[in-house]
Amino acid sequence: MEREYFKELSRRLREEGTETSLANKQKLEVLLHGQPVLYVSTTSDVFLLPAGSKSEEASELYHRVAAVADEVYEYVKVLQGAPLLHVSRLNEDFRLLADFGGAVLAGRERENSRGYQFVTWIWNYNRQGISHGHYYEGNYQAAKQDFAVRSGLISRAQLFSPEQLAELYRATDFLLEEGPEPDEKLPNDQPDGNQAETLREDDSIHPA
C-alpha cells in the first residue's frame, strides 16, 4: 500500500502546487522553495524537519499537508481491502466500499496515475441492477456524504451544521469499518442533483 499511498499523495499535493520528493520507501519529503521542510510517513504521520522548524510558512504548510495526508490514507487504505463490485455492464473495476439502505458506495483507482474516482448508486428493484450514479473525482468526503444521505444514514436537512456533518461522517465511517447498522438510524431523505460534484444518469447496470 505504501507505493500507492505516496503516489496518490504526491499527485494531490502537486495539484495544490506543493512539490514532493520520495526520499525512500518509508518517507515522502515535502519541499518549500526547493528545500525539504516536512516528511510524511507510510502511516500518514507528518513530521517537521529542522529546516522548517522556525518557519511560519512551513508551519502553515504542515497543517495543509497533514489534512491531505489523512484523507488520502483513508481512501487508499479502504480501497486496498475492498472487494470488487460484481455487476454486469460495468466497464470499470469499481470496489465496493459500502452497501446500505438501497445505496452503494464504490471507488476505483483511475489509469495513468489520474487519481481516484468515487461513485454512489441506487439499487434497482429486487437488487437486480444499479442506476442513477453520482460521480466524484477524487472527492472521497463528498462521496461519503452523498452515500450517507442516499442510504438514509442522515437527512439532507442536516448537511449544513458542523455538528451534523460530524454525525454524518461518524455514521458512514461506522458502516465502512464495522459493517452493521449504527444503533441510531437517522431519517431517510434524498439529495437534489446539485450535491454531486459530477452527476449523470446511468443506464441501469445489472449484477453479473
List each model region and its residues.
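Short secondary-structure junctions
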Residues: 13-26, 84-86, 94
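Non-Sec secretion/translocation targeting segments of pathogen effectors
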Residues: 205-208
